[in-house]
Amino acid sequence: QRMSRGLGDVYKRQVLGVVFISADYALYIFSDPFPVNIQLLDSFGVSLTIDKLSGFFISTNAIVTAAVIFYCWDRQKTAFFYMQVTILHGSVNASFICADFISLYVALEVISIASFLLIAYPRSDRSIWVGLRYLFVSNTAMLFYLVGAVLVYQTHHSFNFIGLQGAPSEAIALIFLGLLVKGGIFVSGLWLPLTHSESESPAVS
């Protein structure tokens, strides 16, 4: 336990370094007038787009993560906690630059896993139960999203966001249903209040 907390002191400085790199890169994005497009799987429309809008969200994520790190600075968190914060920070940044449904799906699933581990970090029966419930609701919501993404691909043979134009109404409904439930906007009263009330402040942030 003492060694884990000692490693935690090292990790929290590393996480802070990652946050500063994210903020610096966001400033670089603001200075670049042209967006950057990266094709991962061209035949499937799997790609990333880095523009000023994503730079704004990346800088916001850096500010929030930095606030969490400073809040936890003297709270004796272990290396595992800071590792999950790093994974969560990176996956949230990844979701901001996704330009297709599959890349966004992967990023959101990684966010769900990292969030579950942070919710269950106290390792009490209550926190583990709340974390598992959050993971179940999140994964169920993303199944609707994934079915909608497949319907978009069947129509346009591409997972790119542009495929929403002309996509079946069922695909649009399933995608938005999954995202709204995942984001805690739709039917949030069934699970979100208890998740926030039972989780530690850094995990909720």
Locations of regions flagged by a protein language model:
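Transmembrane helix-loop junctions and nearby membrane-interface residues
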Residues: A26-P33, A66-Q76, I97-D100, A120, ...
